[in-house]
Amino acid sequence: MEQQKAPQVTYLEVGSLVGHNGFVTSIAVSPENPDTIISSSRDKTVMVWQLTPTDATSPGKAHRSLKGHSHFVQDVVISHDGQFALSGSWDNTLRLWDITKGVSTRLFKGHTQDVMSVAFSSDNRQIISGSRDATIKVWNTLGECKFTLEGPEAHQDWVSCIRFSPNTPTIVSGSWDNKVKIWDIKSFKCNHTLTDHTGYVNTVTISPDGSLCASGGKDTFACLWELSSGKPLYKLEARNTINALAFSPNKYWLSAATDDKIIIWDLLTKQVLAEIVPEVKEQAFDSKKKKESKPKAPACLSLAWSADGSVLYAGYNDGLIRVYKSSSQ
């Protein structure tokens, strides 16, 4: 493996979004509403945040807490018109939310175990979900399940992440069976099964132009694939379990959330552009150990770039969403 060069870009923490009382499991942004982001958490809520980029004291504030799920909320996405949020929960259900009104307008029942991942099609007419019950379900917006992807050619373990292509009738799924699958959503057939991972897959994501897929998980590698053919292209090593991946919306970059840092790669050079480690305040004296306890950096679980690519939002297991900007901006 070629020698890694030193990181070339410095990202600074410009503040945090404070409001969740549990792991921040997912973050969603919308080009339609650049002053809003939405997050999900193990505190059973979906949070709508009002961003305040001109406020030097805080990057944003909690605007509305969407409540209805009875267990951890694992994933949230925003419809492409910016009007609705869709969440998946460990209570085995999905919920559709009217963002403006702050109410749940539809409840999706059908999975028999935790819902791990949800997604909208580019025309907002189809909804997909992946679950610990090892199935992928295809729904309409009325909450009716139209098809279930299961059986021998489907995943044989938890479906941890699922995403729609932005411009073709294709979905990509990742699973704890160590496989990534590429599906034709019209025929409901699996076109490709990708087997390069040697551990469970936590995350899959598709590039903004729909040409690439990236996947990551326990084996510490981000695998890049050609979406149309399923051809493996190359691997990038994170040296720690990958919890989430996100392509930059306007640069040829890929970011990875791991247990100890965020890594940003330049996909043209395959080099690390930046490594982001959160600032950790010194912890108080630990009375049980009778000595100073060494502060442990929180693990990054979720990532999202702002629609213009200038800001990186990162959700952590301490309940904070940290906001990062390049020092050159």
Curated annotation (Swiss-Prot):
One Pfam family recorded for the sequence: WD40
Keywords from the UniProt entry: Repeat, Ribonucleoprotein, Ribosomal protein, WD repeat
Gene3D superfamilies, per database record: YVTN repeat-like/Quinoprotein amine dehydrogenase
A GO CC term assigned to this protein in UniProt: phagocytic vesicle
Highest taxon in the source lineage: Eukaryota
GO molecular function: identical protein binding; phosphatidylinositol binding; phosphatidylserine binding; protein kinase C binding; ribosome binding; translation regulator activity
WD repeats mapped onto the chain: 19-59, 68-107, 110-149, 154-193, 196-235, 237-275, 295-328
One GO process term, biological-process aspect: sorocarp development
The keyword Nucleotidyltransferase belongs to this UniProt entry's keyword annotation: no
Record-stated family: Belongs to the WD repeat G protein beta family. Ribosomal protein RACK1 subfamily.
Protein's name in the database: Small ribosomal subunit protein RACK1
Species annotation: Dictyostelium discoideum (Social amoeba)
This protein's encoding gene: gpbB
